[in-house]
């Protein structure tokens, strides 16, 4: 939020933070204002606190936790219980930020009833403000059922990690003839009642066209600068762990991995050499 919006204030650290609860409707109202918003993933209380203090307005508890938290080889492996534990922790630390939670693979695809039950469980057990589900035309009926139940939905089209095997790997979506399908997916999720939509690994010009076409906000991840918001996995933007693979679309603003490793090594060395603890650390 801008300093002139009347809904943010400067903290002692100089960051602009929301002074009231950010609602999904608030972010929808930013559509077309030229004021993009930043979303980051978060998976625990302490990280959520840090991002709230930085003024991040919306956090995503993504099923990317399967990879970066639990060490699974695919997002399809994470369970509802695992997502619930992480999301509840993030909500407790998120301050005024809105929190969106991924519905895990296999919890919403089979039927409208299954989708509504999963979305309701996620919000009831965690306090999250919206759920995110992957897919366009093929999943529009599930989005409609969830929104008809009074639950906000963030859709996710383009590259959808839960469908990585069907898509043939980590590939850019929406090139050539695929642009028409992407636009059809975008229209379908909007018509089904989605409040916003993530565009992942989509050519920038295609994402710009989709953003212009839709009345709901688009959130880009590897989708160029013209989306209404941007999202990154925080491990990618902060280089954690050190030496890990970083997608081309992610910029690094810190080196958390190398700093943490260096701190752990220094601690180990001082303990081994008798340099810690000293008198100042004793009662």
Curated annotation (Swiss-Prot):
Biological process, per Gene Ontology: pantothenate biosynthetic process
Catalytic activity: 3-methyl-2-oxobutanoate + (6R)-5,10-methylene-5,6,7,8-tetrahydrofolate + H2O = 2-dehydropantoate + (6S)-5,6,7,8-tetrahydrofolate
Organism in which the protein naturally occurs: Corynebacterium jeikeium (strain K411)
Group of enzyme by EC: transferase
Protein's recorded name: 3-methyl-2-oxobutanoate hydroxymethyltransferase
Family membership: Belongs to the PanB family.
InterPro entries: Pantoate_hydroxy_MeTrfase, Pyrv/PenolPyrv_kinase-like_dom, Pyrv_kinase-like_dom_sf
GO molecular function: 3-methyl-2-oxobutanoate hydroxymethyltransferase activity; magnesium ion binding
Cofactor: Mg(2+)
Location relative to the cell: Cytoplasm
Task performed by this protein: Catalyzes the reversible reaction in which hydroxymethyl group from 5,10-methylenetetrahydrofolate is transferred onto alpha-ketoisovalerate to form ketopantoate.
Record-listed Mg(2+) binding positions: 63, 102, 134
EC numbers: 2.1.2.11
Record key words, sorted: Cytoplasm, Magnesium, Metal-binding, Pantothenate biosynthesis, Transferase
């Amino acid at each position: 939020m801008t300093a002139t919006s009347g809904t943010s204030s400067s903290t002692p650290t100089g960051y602009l933070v929301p002074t009231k609860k950010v609602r999904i409707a608030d972010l929808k109202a930013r559509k077309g204002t030229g004021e993009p918003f930043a979303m980051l993933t978060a998976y625990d209380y302490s990280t959520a606190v840090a991002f709230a203090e930085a003024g991040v307005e919306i956090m995503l508890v993504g099923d990317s936790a399967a990879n970066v938290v639990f060490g699974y080889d695919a997002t399809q492996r994470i369970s509802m219980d695992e997502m619930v534990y992480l999301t509840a922790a993030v909500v407790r630390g998120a301050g005024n930020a809105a929190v969106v939670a991924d519905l895990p693979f296999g919890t919403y695809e089979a039927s409208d009833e299954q989708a509504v039950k999963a979305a309701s469980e996620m919000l009831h057990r965690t306090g999250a403000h919206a759920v995110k589900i992957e897919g366009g035309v093929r999943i529009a009926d599930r989005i409609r059922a969830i929104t008809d139940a009074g639950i906000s939905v963030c859709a996710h089209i383009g590259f959808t990690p839960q469908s990585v095997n069907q898509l043939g790997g980590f590939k850019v979506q929406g090139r050539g003839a695929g642009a028409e399908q992407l636009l059809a997916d975008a229209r379908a999720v909007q018509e089904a009642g989605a409040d916003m939509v993530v565009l992942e690994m989509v050519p920038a010009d295609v994402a710009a066209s989709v953003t212009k076409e839709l009345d709901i906000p688009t959130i880009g991840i590897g989708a160029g600068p013209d989306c209404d918001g941007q999202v990154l996995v925080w491990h990618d933007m902060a280089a954690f762990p050190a030496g890990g693979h970083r997608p081309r679309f992610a910029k690094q603003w810190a080196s958390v991995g190398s700093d943490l490793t260096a701190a752990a090594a220094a601690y180990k060395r001082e303990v081994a050499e008798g340099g810690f603890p000293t008198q100042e650390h004793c009662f």
